[in-house]
């Protein structure tokens, strides 16, 4: 269905009856160019502001916006919605993945801290055990040295006692011999061995 404006209706008969500008003029016809037709056409209103064309302009405006609305509703809006849904889904997946990775990282950190604490506790226990073992070994070594020294001291005391006893025995014999020699020098004769021994023994008791 076509809508014909009054301006188009006025120009249509002239275009239908007019001759081709490039055709040869008829016999006896003199062709002259004037600016009357162009002047009359130029004196008309600007087409968008021509009140006689408002109806057709409004109709085409409604048609254009209807087509644009249908295009937006059927083609552009669904595509934009699909893109937004896709981006939303992708963003949700990325957030879930980030949360999962963060949870794994937190778990790894907790595991590392637990292992580190266990290693420290084990190291402290090993150090304490080593110190205790060193103390025990030192105590055992000290006791062994003391026992060895005690045995050596006892052996030395026994030896000293033997030496004393032997020395005293030798001193008694020497004293008896000396006393016998002195008596012999004094009286010019020998004294009985029993008397000399008794005299030396009495002297030891008095000493």
Swiss-Prot record:
Compartment(s) where it occurs, according to its Swiss-Prot or TrEMBL record: Cell inner membrane
Entry keywords, A to Z: ATP synthesis, Cell inner membrane, Cell membrane, CF(0), Hydrogen ion transport, Ion transport, Membrane, Transmembrane, Transmembrane helix, Transport
Residues that span the membrane, as ranges: 53-72
Membrane topology field: Single-pass membrane protein
Molecular functions (GO terms): proton-transporting ATP synthase activity, rotational mechanism
Principal cellular location given in the protein's record: membrane
CC terms in the record's Gene Ontology section: plasma membrane; proton-transporting ATP synthase complex
Top-rank taxon, per record: Bacteria
Family matches, as InterPro entries: ATP_synth_b/b'su_bac/chlpt
Function: F(1)F(0) ATP synthase produces ATP from ADP in the presence of a proton or sodium gradient. F-type ATPases consist of two structural domains, F(1) containing the extramembraneous catalytic core and F(0) containing the membrane proton channel, linked together by a central stalk and a peripheral stalk. During catalysis, ATP synthesis in the catalytic domain of F(1) is coupled via a rotary mechanism of the central stalk subunits to proton translocation.
Similarity field: Belongs to the ATPase B chain family.
Assembly and interaction partners: F-type ATPases have 2 components, F(1) - the catalytic core - and F(0) - the membrane proton channel. F(1) has five subunits: alpha(3), beta(3), gamma(1), delta(1), epsilon(1). F(0) has three main subunits: a(1), b(2) and c(10-14). The alpha and beta chains form an alternating ring which encloses part of the gamma chain. F(1) is attached to F(0) by a central stalk formed by the gamma and epsilon chains, while a peripheral stalk is formed by the delta and b chains.
Entry protein name: ATP synthase subunit b 2
Organism: Rhizobium leguminosarum bv. trifolii (strain WSM2304)
